[in-house]
Amino acid sequence: MKICILTIATNKYIQFVEKLYEDISEKFCPGAEINCLLFTDHEIEEIGDKVKVHYIDHEPWPMPTLKRYNYFVKERDFILEHDYCFYFDADMRIDNVVKSEEVCGDLVATRHGYQSLHDKSQQSFDRNPKSLAYVPFDQETVTYYAGGFNGGKTENFIEMAEVIADRVDKDLTNNVVALWHDESHMNRYLIDNPPTL
């Protein structure tokens, strides 16, 4: 099984990458062939033969997170060389071994810990009807998902990435930024296309 790990490390977040990749190498899906795709605005030296670096322009917040799916779409062909791909926030840590059977689903998302404490009507879906991330108050929702870890089969992930990138671009054309940036767009997508894991 081939897995592609996606990470964005701009500004100070570059300091977390080495430890994240160490954790992934030691504890994530043992036995799988893992390649990492790092999106960064830093000029960095080679960090291993299993890491591909994709340089991105330095942009002010929130662009690096808002446009993450746009970055992923640009590396579509590389990602599709793998069976699964997963996005990790650069400052994540893996404390225990994560087996492939625990995480390899068609489309994978992580419930947001803080948002899950609230009644569904108080979870912070984007309620702005001008945004393509819009979720009406009366729409049935199940879970609010965190943007820091998600993935799945590459075909499913790329399909999600293409839809989100297109919606982000259309919002930006209309001078709209979703409430929680890419996470708001991801939640809109996952309401219509629920994760399997």
Please provide the spans of the model-predicted regions.
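Short, hydrophobic beta-strand segments that form beta-sheet elements in well-ordered domains
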Residues: 33-41, 85-86, 91, 107-109, ...
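Short catalytic/ligand-binding loop motif for oxyanion handling, primarily in non-cytosolic enzymes
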Residues: 15, 45-47, 94-98, 102, ...
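Catalytic core and acceptor-binding pocket of nucleotide-sugar-dependent glycosyltransferases
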Residues: 139-197
